[in-house]
Every structure is written in structure tokens, then in C-alpha cells.
Amino acid sequence: MNDARYPIGKFDTANYSSRAENARTISDLPANLRAAVDGLTDEQLDTPYRDGGWTLRQTVHHLADSHINSFCRFKLALTEDEAPTIRPYYEDRWAELADNRMPVDTSLKIVDGIHSRWTSLLESMTDEDFQREFVHPETGNWTLEAVLALYAWHSQHHTAHLTSTRERNGW
């Protein structure tokens, strides 16, 4: 039986070794995300993707929140003289805030904008830039190459939460 928490499996860097493919995944997320929620009703959007999991609405808003943070972390790593220590956040607590009950279109617009800018930034980066790092206080040093791979997976992971829920429910 598939684990609904990880519909595409847990993150494994070996599966995300192509920088070009990872960048394309970042570029493609806005369209893929829109397609994943297209035509869903409010009732469907308020359905958890698994027992005890976020609703589809919360998942869309989480993608916007998380990818804003990642884009900012890229910019910090590219512009600071030393590897910056980034500030983690409580994503589960963010998902409970009132703005996560708003229409998903608000976050789809954010994802459109962030991913357009992120794609432009990725296209401008050199090999050396991708080796720049930031420090996560809980998980240590991350190169931007590794973060790109993680967020390519993250994009596909949460899109799969949406699409697998639709498929399971015949929506």
C-alpha cells in the first residue's frame, strides 16, 4: 500500500541529480499546481489528503509559504559574504493561520510570481553560485544545488498530494 504522506517517495538526492530537470520542475510548478486544483469545489479543497493531514487548500498555501522562504534563502546565500544562518519556521503552525482558509487563487498567484523570479534567478546562476551555501540551524549546511533538488522534489511531492487525492476520490 502506498504511503499517502509520500506519494512519490521520500526525498532522495540520487533521484534529483539533474540541475536542468530540477530547474524545469521549479519553472513548471505554477502550471502543474493550477492543473492539480482546477475545477475543485471549496468542499473538495477542504478535504485532507490523508487522515490527519493538511487539506488540499492548506497544501496549496503551504507551497506558497515554503517557496517564498526558499527563494529568499537562495538570495541570502547568493548575496551574503559568509554562509548565512537561515531562520526555520513552524510550517504546521503557519498552516493553521487564518490566511490558509483564503481562496487558493491567492497562493497560486504568489507561486506564479515567485517561480517566475526564481526561474530567472536560476538561469542566471553559475556553477560556482550553485555551490554557495546557507546554514539551517537544525540540518546544517546546504548548497544551493542541494536546495534546488529538494524543492524540485517538494514541488512534485505536494502536487502529488493534490492529484492523488483527486484520483482516489474520482474528482
Model-derived features: positions:
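A short secondary-structure junction motif
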Residues: 36, 40-43, 81, 125-128, ...
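Short, contiguous, helix-prone interaction/anchoring segments in small proteins
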Residues: 17-50
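Acidic/histidine-rich alpha-helical segments that form the ligand environment
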Residues: 24-36, 93-131, 151
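Active-site rim elements
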Residues: 16-20, 103-108, 145-148
